[in-house]
Amino acid sequence: MQNKPSSYDREDLLASSRGELFGPNGPQLPAPNMLMMDRIPLMSETEGLFGKGKVIAELDITPDLWFFDCHFPGDPVMPGCLGLDAMWQLVGFFLGWVGGQGKGRALGVGEVKFTGQVLPTAKKVTYEIDFKRVINRKLVMGLADGRVLVDGKEIYVAKDLKVGLFQDTSAF
């Protein structure tokens, strides 16, 4: 992909979920409701803590988001696993952005720590992904550290997020 955009809006992310952004064999983001971001203001192959790439994405929080009604009635909080999934989504998106082909699959995470929560009173969740390694050969895989912030305060940290792109997922 030549002259790659360094940012994406909601319509771009929805195009990715339909398989229209990175070609017919490229990775896709999930569709709503599992699409856990509204925009990506930064994509870089050279920035980040390790100098191997950085992604920043944002999710606007409103009290009517679907997960607040069911998790938990009377005690609404965004499930932590959705923030973790968003970080995996962004690692896969980055792999497509750098030209990787295949279907994205989360392969694991080394460590996750939750030190806060996303409540309906929050305004914005920010995801920051710093790439440690990107392999784009026969094997396509990204390894990154990530963090989730709510209204500027760090609440989750994930070390060694791992996502691969696969031509054939039938053996999974």
UniProtKB/Swiss-Prot annotation:
It holds the Pfam family FabA. This is 3-hydroxydecanoyl-[acyl-carrier-protein] dehydratase. It catalyses: a (3R)-hydroxyacyl-[ACP] = a (2E)-enoyl-[ACP] + H2O; (3R)-hydroxydecanoyl-[ACP] = (2E)-decenoyl-[ACP] + H2O; (2E)-decenoyl-[ACP] = (3Z)-decenoyl-[ACP]. Its EC number is 4.2.1.59, 5.3.3.14. GO terms for cellular component: cytoplasm. The active site is at 71. GO terms for molecular function: (3R)-hydroxyacyl-[acyl-carrier-protein] dehydratase activity; trans-2-decenoyl-acyl-carrier-protein isomerase activity. Signal peptide: none annotated. GO terms for biological process: unsaturated fatty acid biosynthetic process. Belongs to the thioester dehydratase family. FabA subfamily. Homodimer. Coiled coil: none annotated. Necessary for the introduction of cis unsaturation into fatty acids. Catalyzes the dehydration of (3R)-3-hydroxydecanoyl-ACP to E-(2)-decenoyl-ACP and then its isomerization to Z-(3)-decenoyl-ACP. Can catalyze the dehydratase reaction for beta-hydroxyacyl-ACPs with saturated chain lengths up to 16:0, being most active on intermediate chain length. Pathway: Lipid metabolism; fatty acid biosynthesis.
